[in-house]
Design a protein with these regions (language model features):
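Catalytic core of pol beta-like nucleotidyltransferases
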Residues: 1-58, 68-73, 82-125
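Glycine-rich beta-strand-to-loop/alpha-helix junction loops that act as flexible
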Residues: 62-65
């Protein structure tokens, strides 16, 4: 019985085509994530400024996928707040403004590892 092996050039061409396809998909996903960030960040900044003006919080940082990752269509907005009277009010204010779920973490309840990473890599709001 003879076993037919695939043409090596055909296999290489197929692999190149698959690689190009996935590289294109990854590039599109990155572009979409950057567009989401660009659309959301100004609204989050404005909302946090309003929260500060209303005395709801003193300091805030963006972390998570909107700060250092690639936010997907189901990503929430993660915010660490300090000097916050009502984290739920801040989450509600920001969430209504940007139309996304918002997760607010109070500085006093955040693990030291999260605070350290946010201070080093987060976006000051």
């Amino acid at each position: 019985m003879t076993t037919l092996l695939p043409d090596p050039d055909l296999v290489k061409a197929f692999r190149r085509a698959v690689r190009r396809h996935f590289e294109g998909q990854v590039a599109l996903e990155r572009e979409a994530a950057e567009a989401r960030k660009a659309a959301v960040l100004p609204t989050v900044l404005d909302s946090i400024a309003r929260a500060r003006d209303e005395g709801l919080c003193e300091r805030a940082w963006l972390f998570g996928s909107y700060a250092w990752g690639q936010p997907g269509t189901r990503s929430d907005v993660d915010i660490l707040v300090d000097g916050c009277r009502d984290p739920f009010a801040v989450a509600s204010l920001v969430g209504r403004a940007c139309g996304l779920d918002v997760h607010v973490v109070d500085w006093t309840e955040a693990p030291t590892s999260l605070r350290d990473r946010v201070l080093g890599e987060g976006v000051t709001l």
